Every structure is written in structure tokens, then in C-alpha cells.
């Protein structure tokens, strides 16, 4: 077996059980991975130097094909209400079949860190069949220096083989596509899909399992820090604006998707960004556009002009879930340490497909826990397989697919941290205004940015607020530079009776969804629920 590249020879591929390989390319950087991806026909170049790959059949995550080993430990520590299980025996069969499938291959290996805080990071080794997948995960996680690579001993190992086809009867899974995690052995197996996001979310899921035991709250959020050292975190599902809104030229970016919150503040799990880039433009998102238009960026399912090879970010013919992966250092004001102090503001982003939520609302601590556990948003087209237009969804903790533990674990941690550090909490609607999806229009990003700026710099505290009659939270009545009508959603609807009926419908959906949490929360959190009676007064 031919092995090339810097690595710890005492802990090579054979330690993972990989045998009879043709070779392993260890810790190759972007230029080498570009060469292999292009030579192997995996990807093409854009005119700006980005590496462009298609993911084929799977253009999003497949949460129904994700499985966790149920053993004596996970039997009681896992949230089985939101996760699917396989037996240890089924996982072992799958693992051995992965190893057999890899024989004769040349694999790409990356040794990386999940987590910017050395006290809580997990040493992660990723074997990939495709060179562009190796570049993707190298871009998304954090990269050790050469000395660390020479002594690197992995704690978590991923093997990613898109050409592998699972057998549901043999492996206990649902289809030929599979993501399987064994927390006891710290192994992740990914097969049957070329969608690279499965790798990063598998590392995230692993950190979500282990970090609460260490007193760290793992979060599906972006984070940035202002000139006064004021940290803000932004919760939200894919497509709700985490990446876009945290990329603010006036604030330092900590990260766009995954963070931990512990005794020393906030830290990024990653070393790169993974931005949705449908309709990406230099006017609306200049930093993300520039980062996606250069050497080192990886574009997924983005259509290129046949002649000029310029990306057409408006073309969603392959999927609405087009993506750009790029290193954090491509953002001019990104933090290279990936760490910041205790948050002063928590922002919960919701893409309200009903168009009845205000563009911003201030939450009490009890309301913050209520809306965190509710995780209301809309599934945005293309983020998951089979979703072609927004659908209302309650995804607890704004990340249900990535929660290995019961949501109350994360909810209680959030409430304690908010109280301890006297954090201001906000709910921001980046979804629809002027009507339900299909009738109204998307909330203007300029309005969202203006309101967020005022919230984060403290000026929004000094304006007059009203109590929303449906949801009970505090809504500003005016802000300089923002049309006052847009702050009160009913004023943006032509049909006021339709607004009332739609708002009541959504209130009922909140109440129905939260019923499963009522026994696990205090009375003040239950009282923070939207109330139809309140709306009737």
C-alpha cells in the first residue's frame, strides 16, 4: 500500500481495519486535492477558481437514513423519540462490509479537529473515497499544524464511501443510502450518498452527544462578536439566515453553523462555512459571494455557464439547495481563533411560512426556552430530500435531526446560561410578510439587518414596545429607517380576517406541538405559550 503525506505512521489506516488498499493520500491540501478531483473527473473548475461538484441523486441530507447503535449506554442516554436505532451486530456487519468495499481503493485521509477549544475538541479522522469530499471536510473542520499531524491519534473516525450500497435486510437500514453512528466505538459510516454535508453533520451529532456531559451546550447556530466584545448567537435551521446574518462587515464572525457554549464563552466547532448559495449576489451578500468566487471554495450543485464557466447562482435546476463551502479565513473579518466571550444576545431565527410573525420580537427567559424547544420554522426547499417548497415545521432546539439526547437536556442548559449571563433574547422572522407563502413575499433582508443591528447595539431597548395579541411577546412599534407597517404583520395583509384566522391556526399548531414538552418544563414556560384567548381580547 502506497501512503503519501504527513501523518502518524503508528496510527495509520490499518488501525481502523482498512486493509489491502491501493493507497492513502494523507492530509493533502487544496492544490493537491484539486488535481486529483479534476484528474478523476469528480469536479470541474469555475472561472473564478472554485471547485464545482455535483452530488447526483442526493442533493440534501437524508435524515430518515441516519441510524445510531442502541446499546446498554445509549438505551438510556439517547433520545429515541427523534433517532433511529440499529443493533451493534448490524453495525458490525455494515462496518466489515465497508472495509471490504474499500479494498483496492486509494483513499484520501484528513486528520482534523472538531472544536476550537482544546479542552473540548474531538480529534477526527475522515477517510473519503472522493478527493473533493476530502477538500470539503478539510475546509469545514479545523486543521492541525504539521507537528500535531505527526503525532495525531484520532478519537472519532469517519469513513465516507459514496459508491457503497447498503442492504436494508442485512444492515438494518432503510435504503441503499446510510449514515450509521456507533458512539461507543466512535465510528461513523457514510455510504450511498455524495452529499458532503452528511460528513459535517455527523461530527456535529457526535459533539452534541458528548459535550453536555462536559458542561458545554452544543448549538446549531452561527455566532459573531461586535467591536465592544459583545457576542451574539443565531439559532436557526438551514435556510433561515444563520450564515447570511452572521456575516456582518461590522462584526467579527466566529462561525456560521455549529458552536459550543461553556464556562469560558462560545467556540466554533468548525474552521469553515457551508452557505446556501441559491440567488447569491454580490449586492445582498458580498462577503459570501467573494468567498465563493475564489480558489479553495467548493461549490455543490451550482450550474456553470457552458462557455464562460461562470457560476449561475440563480439557477436552481439541479436543486434549490446549492451550497458553497469555504474556509473561515476567506471572510475578511472572521475570527481565526474561533472563540469569543459570553453572549449578550441570543437570536432565534424562524422562516414563518404563514406570514403572521413580526420581523423581530423580544423574548422573556421563559419565552426563550419555549421557542427554543418549539423550534418553529419552515423547511426550506432543497435542504432535505423531497422538500420542494417551504413547509411549516417544528424542529426542537432548531436542530432536531442532530440531537442525540432529549431536547430538555439542551433546553435546560440554555435557560441556565441565559439566566447566569443576563442575556437578551430575540425572535426574528426571516420568512414571509404580507401574506402566507405563495401570496406574501420574503422579509426584506435590509429590514432584518436594520432590526438586528439595533438589537445587538442596544438601541432597540430604548424604543416603545407593544404586546403581540397572538404570541404574547414584545414587538417594537417603530425604529428609524424601518417602515412602521412591516413591524405589525396584520398591517401588511390586505385581508385582515384572513390574517386573524391564519394567526389563530399557527397559535393552535404551537400549542399542539408543545404538548409533548409540558411535563418537562416549569409553569412559567408553559405560560409563555401563544394563547388564542389572548388573541381574542
Swiss-Prot record:
One Pfam family recorded for the sequence: PEPCK_ATP
EC number, as in UniProt: 4.1.1.49
UniProt superkingdom: Bacteria
CDD domains: PEPCK_ATP
Pathway connected to this protein: Carbohydrate biosynthesis; gluconeogenesis
GO molecular function: ATP binding; metal ion binding; phosphoenolpyruvate carboxykinase (ATP) activity
GO CC annotation, single: cytosol
Cofactor note: Binds 1 Mn(2+) ion per subunit.
Residues binding Mn(2+), per UniProt: 201, 220, 257
Family the entry assigns: Belongs to the phosphoenolpyruvate carboxykinase (ATP) family.
Reported function: Involved in the gluconeogenesis. Catalyzes the conversion of oxaloacetate (OAA) to phosphoenolpyruvate (PEP) through direct phosphoryl transfer between the nucleoside triphosphate and OAA.
Protein name, UniProt field: Phosphoenolpyruvate carboxykinase (ATP)
Source species of the chain: Rhodopseudomonas palustris (strain HaA2)
Gene: pckA
